[in-house]
Each structure stands twice: as C-alpha cells, then as structure tokens.
Amino acid sequence: MKNLNFFLAFIFISFISCDNEPVPDSFSFGLENDFKINGEYHSVDNSLKFKITEINDSRCPSDVVCIWAGKTDVKIEVESPVTGTIVLSTYDNSVDIVGNFSFKIIDVLPYPISTKTIQLEDYNVTLKIVELTN
C-alpha cells in the first residue's frame, strides 16, 4: 500500500510539472526570443500570433573584406489580433509596430561565411517583442 501511494503521488506530481513546461512555439513579451522561418508563433497569453515568411541575407561574409557590411531583411506576417506585414532590417529599420505590438530585430545567425551556403531553415532570428500600452 505504501508503494502504491508513493507511485500515485509520483504520477500526480509528474502531471503537474508537465503543465508548467513552456510550449515550444510560444514566447514572452519583453524578452529576446529566437524564431525560425515558417514557424507559427504565439505569445504565452495568445494575444499575438505571427510567423516569419522571408529572410534575405546580403551581409558581407565574415571572412571577406567588403566596402559595405550589408544587411538582413526579415519579413514577418502578423496573424492576430490584427493582420499586417512588416519587414525588419539589421541596417535601417530594426523596429516596427503592428497594432499595439513593437517588433525589434536583435540578431540574425549564423553570420555568413564565403565558403558555406546557409539554408533558410538554419537561420535563427532573435526578436524582442513588446506589447505597447495605450
């Protein structure tokens, strides 16, 4: 009987701890979060849903000397609560607003190397998303 009570308590605690694990495609406002292309993401409270639909990387490879450093453009489609499309750039448009949400591009990795082709699915886009108050 003692073993049965221990087993039941263990099962109960396991179920409770599973509820506290973060959902893989969710993010928290005000923090730097990493995102992939074509992933569908939503805020922890489900007040915002979006996906990254394009990444255009024209940065100068780290092992090459260039006149211009280049830039990366990231296209984001916001699906709810309002719909809209924004393009954030590592060069001249690092912040944009859709509805009452501010999107800021922090980084795009990996950084290009002249001898390696980066596949779109290998990119990691770091964004900071803030819910604006009225």
Language model features with spans:
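Sec-dependent N-terminal signal peptides
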Residues: 5-14
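Short acidic-hydrophobic surface loop/beta-edge motif
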Residues: 37-45, 94-99
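Short polybasic amphipathic segments
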Residues: 39, 72-78, 125-130
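Cysteine-centric segments in proteins
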Residues: 44, 50-53, 58, 64-65, ...
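Mature extracytoplasmic domains of secretory-pathway proteins
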Residues: 48-94
